[in-house]
Amino acid sequence: MHRGIPKSSKTQTHTQQDRPPQPSTELEETRTSRARHSTTSAQRSTHYDPRTSDRPVSYTMNRTRSRKQTSHRLKNIPVHGNHEATIQHIPESVSKGARSQIERRQPNAINSGSHCTWLVLWCLGMASLFLCSKAQIHWDNLSTIGIIGTDNVHYKIMTRPSHQYLVIKLIPNASLIENCTKAELGEYEKLLNSVLEPINQALTLMTKNVKPLQSLGSGRRQRRFAGVVLAGVALGVATAAQITAGIALHQSNLNAQAIQSLRTSLEQSNKAIEEIREATQETVIAVQGVQDYVNNELVPAMQHMSCELVGQRLGLRLLRYYTELLSIFGPSLRDPISAEISIQALIYALGGEIHKILEKLGYSGSDMIAILESRGIKTKITHVDLPGKFIILSISYPTLSEVKGVIVHRLEAVSYNIGSQEWYTTVPRYIATNGYLISNFDESSCVFVSESAICSQNSLYPMSPLLQQCIRGDTSSCARTLVSGTMGNKFILSKGNIVANCASILCKCYSTSTIINQSPDKLLTFIASDTCPLVEIDGATIQVGGRQYPDMVYEGKVALGPAISLDRLDVGTNLGNALKKLDDAKVLIDSSNQILETVRRSSFNFGSLLSVPILSCTALALLLLIYCCKRRYQQTLKQHTKVDPAFKPDLTGTSKSYVRSL
């Protein structure tokens, strides 16, 4: 059995010669493999195999290890009479071993994959933290030059508003007490006519001159482009807002039948608030100003009061209501088409029923307070009905949409002293951040409430790269300007600390009655409780908290930006000085060009004059050299010795061949 093992292992290694080697790290296994290699080398030398003769020793050692592993596996296999049966069990055992190795490698692969996943997530987290840190405003560096963040709010935009119509009946239905109040109602109608007729005339003029645009063709394509046209000749002078509002008025007055049915309903109604649903499924709220007073006060008192007293009470009530109408619709008398009425003024016309109106309109939620504070609800007069004495208002109430991730920051600048000059850093009053991006923020169309900035349009616009570097902490990129007069903040309270320019205002410690001095080399003074718990500054006594800012900021440690001018007069003066200096520089450049041209010409003439004697001297030197060389050659020829033809040399002792050659 032992002799058959090498044969089987040899057969196995021939079939598995393409399997990659499996190196081992154990010392004993290496020694055993070397011994096995030494014992089997003689057998392999007797059987020459061309496939293994040229292979390296490492391959042979790996084959030896595979034989050893196979021999260990064969020890657990029962002995069979037939040797071929033994060989048939070898691939099965090997496959089991391979499966066991794969099963052992699978959890390792899973662990390595999880490690790679965590590594990638960690890298992404660090990258996001790096970007966020780069994107954040560097408040510490900005505080050294007097820039302090005072507030940050969310950014919301008013989207396209929803429109709804509100009908206000200006005269109550007093049919039950008509006999006692006929005179008072007549006088009140005259007052209403003096208010409503100018508005009605302006609305009628605009709506009559806005007509449907008739299509020139009869085809479907031409009819699709039909709209409205404005008769500009009849209007005379009209602003863009009036023209736009006039077209809206025309569109709201197209359904005259609905207005007629509304008039009939209001004449028969005694309810103060009534919801009338028209065919267009638009909710119209009808409000009668003094109807509740008539129904709840005057009608029940008819049995206890005289008819004259009832009329007087109704007259006083109507006169008060008329005064309120004048205060509300006064701007509409001057511009009845494009004038807007705020919700705060409209509450008087609604008789104090603002909560019921909001409930009828279905407007509720956390944004209602913000809209009321921002005066987002607007109304316009769209129709005046003189016979029925009612007006129709178009209410537009917006929907707020918060822009996720955008934070609006408010910046305040505190002045600082450099020697005897007082400076302050010029930065925008509001900026916005969104991740890595920093942008300018135009607050002209925005209203700031407790936690939000509500804007009627997009207020974000790009910021210059230089200003972005300033906001991110590069103080050398922050421009500064001189303080003119009393402009600029001398101190500010931030994080419980006082950031003050004690060189320009008096800073006093109220607790110890000592003056807080600021040395000339300091820019600002940061006062906390460790310096003085109770500070008197600029006439105000402030109790400060723990230290949140550095004790002092020295001028030498801060890189200050360039100096600029913001005042119009200063800008104009500086611009004029710059232009004057440019003109002077141009004159100097022209004069320098003339001097250079003169020097160039003079240098050319001097060079030409200097070249003549140099060439003459060179020619004379060459001639002199030639003459000297010729004379030297002649002297050499004269000194040469001449041979006498009669001279015969002594040839004694010379060979005959040499003599013959001579």
UniProtKB/Swiss-Prot annotation:
Residues 225-249 are annotated as: Fusion peptide. The keyword Transmembrane applies. Residues 8-19 have a biased composition (Polar residues). Glycans are attached at residues 141, 173, 179. GO terms for cellular component: host cell plasma membrane; membrane; viral envelope; virion membrane. Pfam families: Fusion_gly (PF00523). The chain crosses the membrane at residues 609-629. The record marks 224-225 as: Cleavage. Residues 1-73 are annotated as: Disordered. Disulfide bonds join 446-455, 470-478, 502-507, 509-532. Keywords: Cleavage on pair of basic residues, Coiled coil, Disulfide bond, Fusion of virus membrane with host cell membrane, Fusion of virus membrane with host membrane, Glycoprotein, Host cell membrane, Host membrane, Membrane, Signal, Transmembrane, Transmembrane helix, Viral envelope protein, Viral penetration into host cytoplasm, Virion, Virus entry into host cell. The keyword Chloroplast does not apply. Residues 1-135 form the signal peptide. The inactive precursor F0 is glycosylated and proteolytically cleaved into F1 and F2 to be functionally active. The cleavage is mediated by cellular proteases during the transport and maturation of the polypeptide. It is found in: Virion membrane; Host cell membrane. It is a single-pass type I membrane protein; Single-pass membrane protein. Residues 630-662 are cytoplasmic. GO terms for biological process: fusion of virus membrane with host plasma membrane; symbiont entry into host cell. Residues 250-278, 574-599 form a coiled coil. Belongs to the paramyxoviruses fusion glycoprotein family. Homotrimer of disulfide-linked F1-F2. This is Fusion glycoprotein F0. It comes from Canine distemper virus (strain Onderstepoort).
